[in-house]
Amino acid sequence: EFRKSDIGSSLPQHFRWSQVGSQSIQLSWDDHKVNGHTPDQVHLFVIPRSSSLQRVEKQVAFSAKTVILEGLHGNTLYYVILTVSAGEEECSITSAQSELRSMCIK
């Protein structure tokens, strides 16, 4: 279970976390422009603090407005790097880092 205080609040405006299961969390966002650009891709890099666990990378279309991170482990701190890109430019137009701590997962 994730408590509100377990989820870092350093997301950009229009993005939010919510719990969808005991080992899953969802990132959702509103349709919006970033620095005047309409984004087309959302990239998530999920890096567990424990080196014995695998990092996860997710990429979804911005139009999906949601992505679910599954298979999170209990009592584990995760660093999540969010990057939003537009067009063929490889550079991100916004980036944020959040911390997730999964607690009480059975």
Swiss-Prot record:
Q: Which domain of life does the protein's organism represent?
A: Eukaryota
Q: Which SUPFAM superfamilies match?
A: Fibronectin type III
The gene designation is: ONCB
User: Residues in domain Fibronectin type-III?
Assistant: 11-106
Q: Which InterPro entries match?
A: FN3_dom (IPR003961), FN3_sf (IPR036116), Ig-like_fold (IPR013783)
What more does the record tell us? ONCA and ONCB are the primary targets of protective antibody responses.
The identity of this protein, by name, is Oncosphere antigen B
